[in-house]
Amino acid sequence: MSSSNCVALVTGANKGIGFVIVRDLCRRFSGDVVLTARDEARGRAAVQQLQAEGLSPLFHQLDIDDRQSIRALRDFLRKEYGGLDVLVNNAGIAFKTADTTPFHIQAEVTMKTNFFGTRDVCTELLPLIKPQGRVVNVSSFVSVNSLKKCSRELQQKFRSETITEEELVGLMNKFVEDTKNGVHRKEGWPDTAYGVTKIGVTVLSRIHARKLSEQRGGDKILLNACCPGWVRTDMGGPKASKSPEEGAETPVYLALLPSDAEGPHGEFISEKRVVQW
């Protein structure tokens, strides 16, 4: 086992917001910080960059689209640390606005990573979260705006306090199927694949927080979704209003909520404040 038994982990962390979250956690979290990336060479280059700044992150490969990759990480964490203290689910993708890929393919590809990949990471790693652990799912304000563009019926489902993970999975699959059949507008969906996937991430966070409260209420684990803002990254583009450092502020705040904090839990957070879902 590692000499430091506390560990924080960030997915999709070789660049952008994820990279800065790792840097901030290296400075402020008392324990090991694991930077993960799909591409090993890029991940190790990011670690070297932080080492040049005098920081000491560790690297582990993780492709959230690959269940075997997730399980290899799970086994590493279990063996080396006996669990996980902080999980930041940051990995995600988006097609550029000008991309000419057919919408139904954009929907399928984006959903596979942003929703189902994140869900698979949660399925494998949430059971490892230690008492007083922190889980942060990086969603987007686009999820709030996209929710408002959904039909009233879909809004009610996504805002439900009793929606199950299985029901949410069914809805995410239905969106992809509806885009393939060319009926997504008729079925009440907005014209944004990215936005719908992030609705999924936000609602999944609410479901998982509810489950944690029911099953591990005494462990004081806090799980939230958050919006980093519009950030100057490869995804956000050069005209975005925030630097990656500013974008990392809310995720890091949630990752480092003090051990005696009662909340927030199961909320959507922007600018360190709870936003009505």
From Swiss-Prot:
Q: Which residues carry this modification: Phosphoserine?
A: S2, S30
Which amino acids does the record list as binding NADP(+)?
10-34, 63-64, 90, 194-198, 231-233
Q: Which family does it belong to?
A: Belongs to the short-chain dehydrogenases/reductases (SDR) family.
Any idea which residues bear N-acetylserine here?
Answer: S2
Catalytic machinery residues: Y194
What is the protein's given name? Carbonyl reductase [NADPH] 1
Subunit comment: Monomer.
Please list the GO biological process terms of this entry.
Answer: lipid metabolic process; vitamin K metabolic process; xenobiotic metabolic process
Q: What are the record keywords, sorted? A: Acetylation, Cytoplasm, Lipid metabolism, NADP, Oxidoreductase, Phosphoprotein
The record's GO molecular-function terms, alphabetically, read: 15-hydroxyprostaglandin dehydrogenase (NADP+) activity; 15-hydroxyprostaglandin-D dehydrogenase (NADP+) activity; carbonyl reductase (NADPH) activity; prostaglandin E2 9-reductase activity; S-nitrosoglutathione reductase (NADPH) activity
Localization (cell):
Cytoplasm
A single GO CC term for this protein reads: cytoplasm
Q: InterPro entries, from UniProt?
A: CBR1-like (IPR045313), NAD(P)-bd_dom_sf (IPR036291), Sc_DH/Rdtase_CS (IPR020904), SDR_fam (IPR002347)
The catalytic activity of this protein is classed by the Enzyme Commission as: 1.1.1.184, 1.1.1.196, 1.1.1.197, 1.1.1.71
What is its biological role?
A: NADPH-dependent reductase with broad substrate specificity. Catalyzes the reduction of a wide variety of carbonyl compounds including quinones, prostaglandins, menadione, plus various xenobiotics. Catalyzes the reduction of the antitumor anthracyclines doxorubicin and daunorubicin to the cardiotoxic compounds doxorubicinol and daunorubicinol. Can convert prostaglandin E to prostaglandin F2-alpha. Can bind glutathione, which explains its higher affinity for glutathione-conjugated substrates. Catalyzes the reduction of S-nitrosoglutathione.
Q: Pfam families, from UniProt?
A: adh_short
Superkingdom, according to UniProt? Eukaryota
Q: What class of enzyme is it?
A: oxidoreductase
Q: Where does substrate bind?
A: S140
What does the record give as the reaction this protein catalyses? Answer: a secondary alcohol + NADP(+) = a ketone + NADPH + H(+); prostaglandin F2alpha + NADP(+) = prostaglandin E2 + NADPH + H(+); prostaglandin E1 + NADP(+) = 15-oxoprostaglandin E1 + NADPH + H(+); menadione + NADPH + H(+) = menadiol + NADP(+)
